[in-house]
């Protein structure tokens, strides 16, 4: 699902109930209380999806940090993914319980991801992708293909990212539109 779906549910239904009055807003600011409130709300949310949901996939745009925090603390079975049309579509992702806050997860098997020209201070650079799902080129557009795919076959995503020490990818923004 695109993040907008779960964000709308959280921001219009769940969060207003958890912060409905001054007392609840005060309690919500206490981390261990917030976690308990999120756990209760997460169970209710799971029931609205039929109670049998094993995985709720999120991708297509960044997930709002407060919504991801809710999903984590609620124990909601969500999984993050990253990909592009040109990569048919998924290149990195997680399974429920394996996600890391703000990360799209590690590269999928058979897919290589590297960071091009990483910044010396932050480690951020353009995300390059290589693998069997990466397109061969843009239809009848050799100039655009040459701009997007390096001579050695790496697709230039135009996205900025960085890896953690365990190979989890974090999207940091756009290099180009």
Which positions does each model-derived feature cover?
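Conserved ATP-binding/catalytic segment of the ANL
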Residues: 107, 111-114, 121-177
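Active-site glycine/GP-rich loop and adjacent strand/helix microenvironment
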Residues: 61-62, 66-73, 89-95, 104-109, ...
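Short, flexible, glycine/charge-rich loop motifs used to bind or transfer phosphoryl groups or to couple energy/partner
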Residues: 43-47, 69, 102-104, 117-118, ...
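Alpha-helix N-cap/helix-start capping motif
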Residues: 3-4, 31, 61, 132, ...
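Gly/lys/ser-thr-rich phosphate-binding loops in alpha/beta enzymes
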Residues: 1-8, 175-177
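Gly/Ser/Thr-rich phosphate-binding loop
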Residues: 7-99, 112
């Amino acid at each position: 699902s695109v993040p907008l779906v779960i964000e709308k549910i959280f921001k219009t239904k769940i969060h207003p109930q958890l912060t409905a009055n001054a007392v609840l807003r005060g309690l919500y600011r206490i981390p261990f209380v917030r976690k308990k409130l999120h756990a209760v709300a997460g169970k209710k949310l799971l029931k609205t999806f039929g109670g049998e949901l094993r995985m709720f996939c999120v991708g297509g745009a960044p997930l709002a940090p407060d919504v991801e925090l809710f999903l984590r603390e609620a124990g909601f079975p969500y999984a993050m993914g990253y990909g592009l049309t040109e990569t048919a579509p998924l290149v990195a992702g997680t399974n429920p319980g394996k996600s890391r806050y703000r990360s799209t997860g590690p590269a999928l098997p058979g897919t290589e991801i590297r960071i091009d020209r990483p910044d010396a201070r932050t480690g951020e650079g353009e995300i390059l992708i290589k693998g069997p799902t990466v397109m061969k080129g843009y239809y009848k557009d050799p100039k655009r293909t040459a701009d997007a795919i390096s001579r050695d076959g790496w697709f230039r995503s135009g996205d900025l990212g960085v890896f953690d020490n365990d190979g989890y990818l974090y999207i940091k923004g756009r290099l180009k539109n």
